[in-house]
C-alpha cells in the first residue's frame, strides 16, 4: 500500500514490520503501520522536570511505573508517520486510533505528524494538518515533536557552502576535517557487499556502541533488521564506510538512502573512542554533502539528533507533532495542561531563536 509522507523507501517500513525493535510488537487492524512498545514518560520531558521527578523520594523504586505500554501509529524507521494515500479520511483515521489502540492501551500516539514540512508535497502537508485537527476534535492532545534537520543543496560547491558559515565555524570545521587524510572512505551499495554475516556483525556492533552511549533509549533495532536492510539491493541504500588508512580498522559507517531526489541519513555506527578522535561526525557530514552535491540531489536530510550541532553546520529544521490519546479522562486533562513540559525540542527552538 502506498503511503503519504515518505522520505525514504517503503521497504524500510516493511523491514520494520518483519523485524521490529526489541520489545516491540506490530499491531494489526489499522489502515496505517502501528506497533506497541514500552514508553518512558520522561523521554521527551524537559531537563528541569526530569531533575525534579528524579529527586523525589524512592524514585529508584517506583520509577518503573513511568514506563507505560503504549500503542503507536507510525514506525521508528520513517521520518514521518506513514499515512494512507487513499481510502481513509482524517476523521476516520482518528476514530480508528481512538477506538482501537486508544481503548486497548493507556496511551495511544500518532507519532511524527509533519507540520508544513518543506520536504513534502502540499497534499501530504494538508492531510497531516487535517489528521491533527481531527484528532484534537476527538480528544487527543497535540504535543510538539522533534526537530528534523535538513540542508538544501542550493550551493554549487562546498566552498560556497562553507562561505555561509561564520568565520569561527569554518575554522573549527576545517580543523576537524584534517583527520580525513588518515581515513579510507568507501561508498557501498546495499546488497551483495553485505552477503557475509561477518560484514553485518561488524556494522551491528558499531550500531550497538552508538545505542549504548545515547541519552534516549527507545527503539533498539535488531541484528535481523540490519541484515535485512543492508542486504536489500533494491532499496537505494548507500553505506558510507570509514576505515583507518593504516590499520584498515572499521571506525564508522553511515547508512543513507537516495529517495525522491534527496539523500536521507538513517543510521550510524561508530567505534569509540577512535571515531571521536577521527572527528567522524563532521567528516561524515561533509562526505554526505559532497555526495548529494555530486549526484545533483536537492536536499540532505540529516535526522533528529544533535540539533544544536547541526544548526552550527548550517542545517535548517522542520518540526513534527504527536497526537496523544490518554484513555483515562482525568489523566487526559492533566496531559493537556502539562504537554508543554514534554516539548524539549520546541524549547530548544525558542531558545535558539531568541539567541
PLM features: residue spans?
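N-acyltransferase acceptor-side catalytic subdomain
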Residues: 1-355
Amino acid at each position: 500500500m502506498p503511503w503519504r509522507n515518505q522520505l525514504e523507501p517503503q521497504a524500510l517500513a516493511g523491514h520494520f514490520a518483519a523485524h521490529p525493535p526489541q520489545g516491540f510488537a506490530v499491531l494489526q487492524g489499522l489502515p496505517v503501520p502501528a506497533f506497541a512498545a514500552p514508553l518512558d514518560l520522561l523521554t521527551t520531558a524537559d531537563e528541569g522536570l526530569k531533575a525534579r521527578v528524579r529527586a523525589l523520594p524512592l524514585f529508584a523504586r517506583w520509577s518503573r511505573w513511568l514506563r507505560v505500554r503504549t500503542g503507536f501509529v507510525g514506525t521508528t524507521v520513517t521520518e514521518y508517520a506513514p499515512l494512507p494515500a487513499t481510502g481513509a479520511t482524517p476523521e476516520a483515521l482518528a476514530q480508528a486510533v481512538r477506538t482501537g489502540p486508544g481503548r486497548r492501551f493507556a496511551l495511544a500516539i500518532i507519532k511524527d505528524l509533519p507540520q508544513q514540512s518543506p520536504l513534502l508535497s502540499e497534499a501530504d502537508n494538508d492531510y497531516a494538518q487535517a489528521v491533527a485537527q481531527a484528532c484534537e476534535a476527538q480528544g487527543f492532545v497535540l504535543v510538539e515533536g522533534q526537530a528534523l534537520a535538513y540542508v538544501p543543496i542550493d550551493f554549487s560547491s562546498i566552498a560556497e557552502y562553507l562561505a555561509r558559515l561564520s568565520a569561527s565555524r569554518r575554522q573549527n570545521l576545517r580543523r576537524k576535517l584534517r583527520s580525513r587524510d588518515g581515513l579510507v572512505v568507501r561508498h557501498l551499495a546495499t546488497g551483495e557487499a553485505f552477503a557475509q554475516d561477518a560484514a553485518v556483525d561488524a556494522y551491528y556492533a558499531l550500531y550497538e556502541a552508538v545505542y549504548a552511549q545515547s541519552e534516549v533509549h527507545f527503539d533498539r533495532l535488531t541484528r535481523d533488521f540490519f541484515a535485512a536492510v543492508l542486504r536489500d539491493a533494491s532499496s537505494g541504500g548507500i553505506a558510507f564506510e570509514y576505515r583507518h588508512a593504516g590499520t584498515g580498522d572499521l571506525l564508522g559507517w553511515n547508512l543513507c538512502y537516495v529517495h525522491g531526489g534527496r539523500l536521507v541519513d538513517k543510521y550510524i555506527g561508530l567505534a569509540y573512542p577512535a571515531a571521536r578522535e577521527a572527528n567522524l561526525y563532521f567528516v561524515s557530514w561533509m562526505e554526505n554533502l559532497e555526495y548529494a552535491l555530486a549526484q545533483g540531489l536537492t536536499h540532505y536530510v540529516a535526522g533528529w539528533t544533535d540539533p544544536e550541532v547541526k544548526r552550527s553546520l548550517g542545517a535548517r529544521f522542520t518540526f513534527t507533532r504527536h497526537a496523544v490519546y490518554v484513555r483515562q479522562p482525568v489523566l487526559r486533562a492533566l496531559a493537556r495542561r502539562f504537554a508543554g513540559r514534554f516539548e524539549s525540542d520546541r524549547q530548544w527552538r525558542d531558545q535558539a531563536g531568541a539567541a
